[in-house]
Amino acid sequence: MSLPPGFLDELRSRLSLTQVVGRKVSWDLRKSNQGKGDMWAPCPFHQEKSASFHVDDRKGFYYCFGCHAKGDVITFVKETENVGFIEAVEILAREAGMPMPQRTAGEQERADLRSGLVEVMEASVRFYRLQLAGGAGAAARDYLDRRGLDMAGRERFGIGYAPDSRTALWSHLTGAGVAPQRIVEAGLAIAPDDGGTPYDRFRGRIMFPIRDARGRCIAFGGRALDPNARAKYLNSPETPLFDKGRTLYNIGPAREAAGKGNTLLVAEGYMDVIALSEAGFAAAVAPLGTAVTEDQLRLLWRIADEPVVALDGDKAGIRAALRVVDLALPLLEAGKSLRFALLPEGRDPDDLIRAEGRSAMQRVIDRAEPMVSLLWRRETEGHVFDSPERRAALDKRLREVLRTIRDPSLRRHYGEEIARLRQDLFGRGSA
């Protein structure tokens, strides 16, 4: 969408950057000068206690002296709401009382589609929640009771239940006047190849709304109650609203909690996030049925400098952690990394918290390992280096790993740390 000359300048002039930013931060009034529009606060983009985030209201720019985030009011809305440029402009234009320039027919059609799909998704959230509260949801309520999730927690996360019926949601939505094609486009129903009546995608499942950073339901995750179900967990397909590789479960509340100093945690699934949040670890997120992607990593780093990935300490958990390490290495920048909190084997966060309490989970987080430790473990554990050839093979593998780090300074520091670990393994006399 093209914007006419002067529109963005007019938009920026109508809005106070401190007013927009002030909804996301707590100003340090001792350090700030309100009269001059010179404001300071703890940064909303990374975890800190000091006020290193500076807003110059007169110039209309912000800059963080800690993580180096910078930009204007549009950039701020883009980053804090996790939206694109045009959507950020639309948000601010509504606030400023400025009509958006006329869209092309195609742009208007896409915007109307997204708006309509959000309405369908929110109607589905309400339907699923009613089903959980009714007779059909008895088994689902029992499961949630066994998992220790009380009514307040269910309300907080909007959890519902999809009845074990092919057309329960379909009949409800079409009966309420929703266009059949919209239900299919939202990923809530599947249209048969033979042209018959579409049927509900989610059946006999506990339903977890997946919301974007602005709190809008854009997808669902469903947990099967039937132990013999083909898929224990089922996510919405990708739609005009939902790109699973660019979204994280619980992203909105987690971003807010991380901005208040809570450690940003990356768990494996919905129930892990909910268990962590209910235990007071409010800045918890999870990927959506896939391994962590580059886009998700960049999103995590916009929230915190060093997110902690919490995984099972068994072999599968270690393999998953190493896949994240391999993905992250080429993307690393100074000050941006990951740590890994490996839980006791066979335990997920919910198991650990219920068995040993919140303090046990906190100890696991406090012992989180840096990426280089996992790399070293992968290359050395279970190996015997009793010959020059085996040691040379290790050196070759480590050089290959180091070459994937693009940042020269980080590559040098990783090399120094690996050299230190190598000396500890082989003795100071080795070269």
Which residue ranges define each predicted feature?
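N-terminal structured subdomain of primase-like DNA metabolism proteins
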Residues: 1-108, 163-164, 170, 420
